[in-house]
């Protein structure tokens, strides 16, 4: 933290914003990109920090207030949104210059949070956390993989033709796709870039003719290159800056919710920008017959694993010691019996007794309770399958508690 605050002086800043998200605005970021956890020790899925010269603030929503206070310790003052916003704590008589990394913020969100009279925002292209993060975890690179029409119902070529109609209606020259989940949809590919979601970290630039420039690490495309349309031109991740800079007098559509300030600034110098929600969100939301069948299939598969697990709990909790963490692992093992299972869809909530009342509780060696007679046991979990995603919450009574207790606990979820 001392090194970081020295950088504030070096860059003539009064403070610096550190968000949870990575450059792709993913909810779940890998350890090599979790700058907020590195600086604050907070491991929740949402939040941001403001580091000032003499004080540090950690902003989270109500799900994470207790967790943030425990993990960040005395180094940070935890602020719960929406009870308070940055404008409520940055009330100083003097003007403050607050720095930010333009690749980690959208204009709309930054303006919403920091449209404050005494605050001057300063874009800093070098990420200051990265400068002081010497023992950074290694970034694992795994190749993307393709989904067959059996799982998607519609080929990538058909999806591209559908999106092409959007160009004609809106009279734009290019569509910049910056949301990884939308790239996954249009190209029928998946990846390993997020711990709980099979999204591919990449960017895509499509023109009105259906030609696509695809930007990502070359090591990630080895398994998908042959299966994709020949209209796709593959580029290294960092080549996007050069290609965007060279676009001139074009009408370019971008999503203000997922396009960073950095890329927007590259484009708006020489082009006309149209900022709306990425049309792929709309196309993606209309599920075809195959997708609907696969959704049902994924819940039947997951339901079988969960049913076996709950039966196992009821049968064994009196006979042997079952802790929250052991139960969590056992559920994962039941899911793994299905060959189509990939990995969890989020951090499992496995809580017993008083821990069921903690929002977004995550069992740890320190909090790991044994399941006891008379407890309520709550499990909120999900799985990623090759054909769908699940998210299921169940509360069971371990003996004497009534149905009413279970209803109350489920409502808290």
For every predicted segment, state its role:
Residues 1-413:
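Active-site neighborhoods and metal-handling regions in enzymes and metal-associated proteins
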């Amino acid at each position: 933290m001392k090194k970081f605050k020295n950088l504030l002086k070096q860059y003539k800043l009064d403070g610096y914003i550190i968000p949870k998200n990575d450059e792709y605005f993913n909810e779940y970021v890998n350890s090599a990109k979790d700058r907020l956890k590195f600086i604050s020790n907070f491991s929740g899925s949402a939040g941001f920090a403001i580091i000032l010269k003499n004080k540090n603030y950690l902003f989270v929503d109500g799900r994470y207030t207790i967790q943030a206070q425990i993990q960040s310790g005395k180094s940070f003052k935890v602020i719960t949104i929406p009870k308070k916003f940055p404008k409520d704590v940055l009330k100083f008589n003097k003007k403050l210059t607050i720095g930010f990394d333009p690749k980690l913020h959208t204009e709309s969100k930054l303006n919403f949070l920091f449209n404050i009279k005494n605050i001057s925002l300063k874009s800093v292209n070098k990420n200051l956390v990265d400068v002081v993060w010497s023992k950074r975890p290694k970034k694992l690179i795994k190749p993307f993989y393709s989904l067959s029409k059996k799982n998607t119902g519609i080929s990538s070529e058909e999806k591209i033709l559908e999106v092409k109609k959007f160009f004609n209606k809106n009279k734009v020259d290019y569509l910049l796709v910056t949301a990884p989940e939308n790239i996954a949809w249009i190209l029928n590919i998946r990846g390993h870039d997020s711990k709980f979601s099979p999204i591919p970290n990449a960017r895509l630039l499509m023109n009105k003719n259906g030609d696509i420039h695809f930007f990502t690490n070359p090591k990630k495309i080895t398994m998908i290159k042959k299966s994709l349309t020949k209209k796709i031109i593959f580029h290294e991740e960092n080549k996007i800056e050069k290609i965007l800079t060279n676009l001139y007098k074009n009408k370019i559509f971008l999503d203000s919710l997922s396009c960073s300030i950095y890329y927007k600034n590259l484009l708006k110098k020489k082009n006309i920008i149209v900022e709306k929600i990425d049309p792929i969100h709309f196309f993606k939301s209309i599920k075809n017959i195959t997708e609907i069948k696969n959704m049902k299939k994924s819940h039947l598969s997951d339901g079988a694993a969960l049913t076996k697990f709950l039966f196992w709990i009821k049968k064994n909790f009196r006979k042997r010691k079952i802790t929250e963490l052991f139960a969590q692992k056992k559920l994962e093992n039941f899911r793994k019996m299905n060959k189509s299972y990939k990995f969890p869809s989020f951090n499992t909530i496995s809580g017993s007794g008083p821990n069921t009342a903690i929002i977004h509780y995550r069992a740890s060696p320190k909090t790991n309770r044994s399941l006891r007679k008379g407890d309520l046991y709550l499990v909120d979990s999900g799985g990623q399958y090759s054909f769908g995603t699940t998210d299921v919450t169940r509360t069971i009574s371990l003996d004497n508690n009534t149905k009413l207790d279970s209803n109350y606990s489920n409502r808290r979820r």
